[in-house]
Swiss-Prot record:
The record marks R242 as: Lowers pKa of C-terminal Cys of second active site. Its main location: endoplasmic reticulum. This is Probable protein disulfide-isomerase A6. Residues 1-28 form the signal peptide. One of its GO terms (cellular component) is endoplasmic reticulum lumen. Pfam families: ERp29, Thioredoxin. The keyword Iron-sulfur does not apply. GO terms for molecular function: protein disulfide isomerase activity. It comes from Medicago sativa. The lineage of its organism: Eukaryota, Viridiplantae, Streptophyta, Embryophyta, Tracheophyta. Its EC number is 5.3.4.1.
C-alpha cells in the first residue's frame, strides 16, 4: 500500500514538473489598467493595443476574465502589443468616447491611431490571440498554465483522498455543468496557491463519468465540494464562498497554513505561539538567564510535531545566533533577508527566507 501510494505521488510530481517545463505560467499582472488620465498616453502611439471595456458587475465580463488574463503573459515578448482594460463604471467618458454601449466590448487600436476596430469573434484566449496576430502582425500562441489540481479516478481516489497525512479538498464536477466551468479557473488558482504545501491537496473528480463513486459521497449536484482533513476521512461538506480569497481562508484555517491569494507566505507563517512566549522571556532576560530560557526553548521544541517541529528548529538556530552575536543579530539578519527576498529567487527559497524572517521578527 505504501509503495503504491509512493508511486502515485511520484507520477503526480513528474507530471507537474513536465507541465512546468513545457508551458509558461499565466498571470494577469501585466494587463495595463487604463483610466481617463492615461488612456491617450498609453494607446495610439508605438504599440497596437487590445482594450477590453468592462463593468465590474457584468456577468459576461467575469466569464471573459480568465480568458483575457491569459493574453498579457503570452504577448509579453511582443513589444509592439499592449493588452489593456478600462473599467467603464469608473471611467465613463472614455467608454462613451469610443462608442461602448455594452459589456464587455473589445477593441483593437492600431499603432499611431485612436480609431479602433471592434473584435467580433468568440471570447476565448485563442480567438483573441488570433485577432491580435492578424491586426498587429504578430505570431503568438497562448501560453497554457500548468495545472496543480490532482485529477482523481476510482483507481487513485482512496490513495490520494484517504491519505491520513494529507488535507484534501475535492471538487465533484460534471463537464457540462456551467457553474463548474465558472469555478474551474478559480479552483486552478487555489491549487496554485497551495502547490508548495506538502500536506495539502486540491483535487477534482469527474462525477458524471464516475457516478458510483460520487454517489458513495452523497453527491447530488454540481459542483459539490468536500473537504477530507487528516482527522476525518469521511469528508465534510464545503459550504463557504467560491472566490479565491474564500478558499484560501478556509484552507489556511483548516490546515494551519499561512498563504495569501498569490501563494506567498504571510507574516504569520512559521510562528509557534508557545515558543513566542518563551522568546519574549529570552529577549528580556540578562545573559545568564538567557541560557536557562534557551534550555526551556530546547525542551519545548522536542515536543513539537510536523511543520511546527521544523519551525522550532529555526527558533533554536536563531536563539543560538542571538546568544553568540547579541541583540543586534535579529535586526541585521532581517535586513539581509529582505534584500534577498527582493531578488529573483525560486518560490521554495522565498518560503524558506520568509519563514526565517517571520521568526526573527519575534526576537527583534
Amino acid at each position: 500500500m505504501k509503495m503504491e501510494m509512493h508511486q502515485i505521488w511520484s507520477r503526480i510530481a513528474l507530471a507537474s514538473f513536465a507541465f512546468a517545463i513545457l508551458f509558461v505560467s499565466v498571470s494577469a499582472d501585466d494587463v495595463v489598467v487604463l483610466t481617463e488620465e492615461n488612456f491617450e498616453k498609453e494607446v495610439g502611439h508605438d504599440k497596437g493595443a487590445l482594450v477590453e471595456f468592462y463593468a465590474p458587475w457584468c456577468g459576461h465580463c467575469k466569464k471573459l476574465a480568465p480568458e483575457y488574463e491569459k493574453l498579457p503573459n503570452s504577448f509579453k515578448k511582443a513589444k509592439s502589443v499592449l493588452i489593456a482594460k478600462v473599467d467603464c463604471d469608473e471611467h465613463k467618458s472614455v467608454c462613451s468616447k469610443y462608442g461602448v454601449s455594452g459589456y464587455p466590448t473589445i477593441q483593437w487600436f492600431p499603432k499611431g491611431s485612436l480609431e479602433p476596430k471592434k473584435f467580433e469573434g468568440p471570447r476565448t484566449a485563442e480567438s483573441l490571440a488570433e485577432f491580435v496576430n492578424t491586426e498587429g502582425g504578430t505570431n503568438v500562441k497562448i501560453a497554457t498554465a500548468p495545472s496543480h489540481v490532482v485529477v482523481l479516478t476510482p483507481e487513485t481516489f482512496n490513495e490520494v483522498v484517504l491519505d491520513g497525512t494529507k488535507d484534501v479538498l475535492v471538487e465533484f464536477y460534471a463537464p457540462w455543468c456551467g457553474h463548474c466551468k465558472s469555478l474551474a479557473p478559480i479552483y486552478e488558482k487555489v491549487a496554485a496557491v497551495f502547490k508548495s504545501e506538502d500536506d495539502v491537496v486540491i483535487a477534482n473528480l469527474d462525477a458524471d463519468k464516475y457516478r458510483d463513486l460520487a454517489e458513495k459521497y452523497d453527491v447530488s449536484g454540481f459542483p459539490t465540494l468536500k473537504f477530507f482533513p487528516k482527522g476525518n476521512k469521511a469528508g465534510e461538506d464545503y459550504g463557504g464562498g467560491r472566490d479565491l480569497d474564500d478558499f484560501v481562508a478556509f484552507i489556511n484555517e483548516k490546515s494551519g497554513t499561512s498563504r495569501d491569494a498569490k501563494g506567498q507566505l504571510t507574516s504569520e507563517a512559521g510562528i509557534v505561539e508557545d515558543l513566542d512566549e518563551l522568546v519574549k522571556e529570552f529577549v528580556a532576560a540578562n545573559d545568564e538567564e538567557k541560557k536557562a530560557v534557551f534550555a526551556r526553548i530546547e525542551e519545548e521544541v522536542k515536543k513539537l510535531e510536523g511543520s511546527a517541529s521544523r519551525y522550532g528548529k529555526i527558533y533554536l538556530k536563531v536563539s543560538k545566533k542571538y546568544l553568540e552575536k547579541g541583540s543586534d543579530y535579529a535586526k541585521n539578519e532581517i535586513q539581509r533577508l529582505e534584500r534577498l527576498l527582493e531578488k529573483s529567487i525560486s518560490p521554495a527559497k522565498a518560503d524558506e527566507l520568509t519563514l526565517k524572517k517571520n521568526i526573527l521578527s519575534t526576537y527583534a
